[in-house]
């Protein structure tokens, strides 16, 4: 069965067509600048040339129509007709407390997703637009919603509650939800598989380090804590997001800079993180690593602070699980920045962590980067959120 995986942003749409039998991606692409001048679709069939076409895309329905047209194109398509697409898996950012697992999309499910729009105002409305566009063009094809938040719904109350008046939880469901759940689930399961151990017997910490970044604690196959909160702003220092700060800083900045709450939130989401910390040098870790190696003081400070925060979260999750067996690094930075992994692991001597620097510099494969005598196994596991979404989709429609 071929599964179309859709990830809709407010003005973009990523897609992959995955053969669920072989688990191979047979085509992928990206629609950019939807509803904006200069919109384009990039399409790459497996083993074929990448094609880029600038074409008007006034809305997501037109973007999905172009995706389906590319997949069924006589010359470069990979399926003869839409009948060869067995189901569509949609990435949904926020499922609130309503969804602890993936689900077949019905009218009631769409209503429940819409009720979570307040919790993810940039993402959920776009996710719903993608579902509606697909339903319009593929009315008989089953659709599945896979939630970023679902994996973290096993967190105990003491891990997800904030020290705020309880009425805010009762009225508005203000609590910690966590994100990147599909990645944390895939990577933790893959680590157990690579090690040949039972998932339910392990204590695993996953560090998903991309432009957005989060850490999760997975004990005996269930998530017991994660670093992101009500929104993806909590936790680690990220590309442009601040991560954890003293909440009173917002009032302080408001008085000093004359900014309102929306302007302050823009600073915390778009101008902070390693970008702000590096004196606005870059949010790209390749630039920061170059600067670190050159001895640039801003880059050294930024890299050290970022890695210290990651290590601090790892340490706290060792306490939360009363131990750890495996620490995994994944996502763009976690997979491709050996310097970040080294600097993080320098703080983990108390866990008996010892890194093999040759292994640490290998790329693109599932690998243990700790030495054979390291008391805790440290691994690099490339994430594959699209495959995880396809697997979830197949399990529900078969």
Please tell me what each predicted stretch does:
Residues 70-85, 191-198, 314-325:
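Phosphate/pyrophosphate-binding loops at sites that engage ATP/ADP/AMP, CoA/4′-phosphopantetheine
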Residues 12-57, 229:
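Short glycine-rich, Thr/Ser-proximal phosphate-binding strand/loop in the N-terminal lobe
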Residues 1-4:
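Extreme N-terminal starter segment of soluble prokaryotic enzymes
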Residues 219, 225-257, 266, 331-362:
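Catalytic phosphate/nucleotide-handling subdomain of diverse soluble enzymes
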Residues 151-254:
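Glycine-rich phosphate-binding loop of actin/hexokinase-like ATP-binding domains
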